[in-house]
Every structure is written in C-alpha cells, then in structure tokens.
Amino acid sequence: MGGQNRATTTLEERRPRRADAARNFDALVAAGREAFAEDGSGASLEDIARRAGVGIGTLYRNFPTRDDLIETLYLREVAALADAADEVADLPPRQAFEAWLDRFVEYVGTKHVLLDGLNRESTVFAECRGVMLGAGEPLLRRAQEDGAVKADVAIADVVKLIAGVSAVAYDDEEQRRRVLGLAIGSLRS
C-alpha cells in the first residue's frame, strides 16, 4: 500500500503526453472497455475506434495490436484494484480487508473478458499478478494480526477462492452475495 504501483507506472508510460493524443488514448480505452464488456475479447477494433470518435489509424497508432489494447485495459483494472487497497487502508483491519475483497469481486467480473484475449505469457500479466497480490497482502496481514482472519491464510489462496466463487453463474444477486459471504466467512478466525 502507499505509493504508486507498477500497473499505474506502466499505464503512464503508455499514455501519450500531448493533450489531444492523451484524450484520444483515454477515449479508446473507455470505448474498448465498453466494447469488450459487451462483445467479449473478439470485439471489433473498428467499432472501438468509432465509439471513441477517432479513426482506425488513431487506434492503431495507440495500440498497434489487439493485445496492446487488452493489456492496457487489464493494467487499468489492476491499477484500480491496487488503488482500492490504499483507499480502504485506514478502515479497521477486518473491514479494510473485506472492502478490498468486494473491489476484487468487481475486478474479477471484468477480468474474465480481458483474460480471454490476453497473452498469459506476457510480462504485463506476470507484473499485474504481483501488483494485485502485493495490494491485498498488507490488508490480509493486518486482519490476521488483529485476529479477524485465520493466521494460516495466504493472499494467493484468498485470490483463488474469491475468483472461483465470483466466476460461478448464480440465480440472482442475493444468492451471489450469500455464497460470497460464506467464502469470506470461511477466512475469519
């Protein structure tokens, strides 16, 4: 927690400096997020450019390949997850950890669409995993030190548990919250 994470740094390195180019970049990222959420990893790049209000050449100037756009979207999600750890850090330990887990559930919802199109061998994927685990680890440790979470729980296990529970199809939102509550409850001391 505290300070800039690697995902944010990588995003800043990718984002153009000129104001008009930065606006186009941001519009493409927002349009890409919408299109991938609606159409999956096979979303049309032409549609993304149209939604962003730019030409296809501008899209390719910013993102030479589909993978480049997907990696940037994934970096944004991971950076937001890391930022969420900082945002909840001042809450009581258990509340902070569980608030971050709620944000992690939101992240899992966008992650599946992006991971379908992401090259899992890329360095970005490996770095993002480290950023994500690094964001949750201090919150977990504080909750463990406070006696709110079992001492033998590891952040990598928590991430797998919550990701698995979040990926299942539920009858309704109430059932999803109940099952997620059971999973989080299983971590408590």
Each language-model region and where it sits:
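C-terminal peripheral helix-coil segments that are non-catalytic and often amphipathic
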Residues: 1-12, 99, 138-148, 164, ...
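Basic, helix-initiating cap at the start of DNA-binding domains
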Residues: 1-42, 46-51, 68
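Short hydrophobic/aromatic patch on the recognition helix
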Residues: 53-63
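Alpha-helical DNA-contacting segments of helix-turn-helix folds
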Residues: 63, 70-77
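A secondary-structure capping/hinge motif
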Residues: 67-69, 113
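Hydrophobic alpha-helical connector segments
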Residues: 72, 82-109, 124, 131-133
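Helical hydrophobic small-molecule/effector-binding pocket
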Residues: 90-117, 145-152, 170-174
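Short linear capping/connector segments at secondary-structure termini
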Residues: 116-124
